[in-house]
Amino acid sequence: MLYFAYGSNLNHFQMKKRCKDSKFLKKIKLKDFRLTFRSKYRAADIEARKNSTVPGGLFEISKSDERKLDVYEDYPLLYKKYYFNYYGKKIMTYTMTKKTKFKYPTERYLNVIKCGYKDCKLEKKYLLKALMIL
């Protein structure tokens, strides 16, 4: 199964620890979505936004990995699954079930994401824009 990570799961160390079978394939961009931070947990989320882009990491994961991600993402309470096609391939990601106002992430959580951006060689401008710094 193909999985699109855009938040803390971009971090290769964390992803491998959580999902032992996972393999990072490449960086990709999800068009017409934007990255934001929401909920009392101040967690990363994506929402539809015309002419916006969310960079992320494409991972191959096993069924066992998917079950572990479901637990981590508090599926189906906090996050729901969202599927999209990318060059004919079906890809799964998570998006929050309840959209709340923007909440700045904790420093610890943000550092995990920053490491993930580095691991996946993503442009930080997207993260800075989501944090309302740009």
Which role fits each region the language model picked out?
Residues M1-L134:
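Glycine-aromatic micro-motifs
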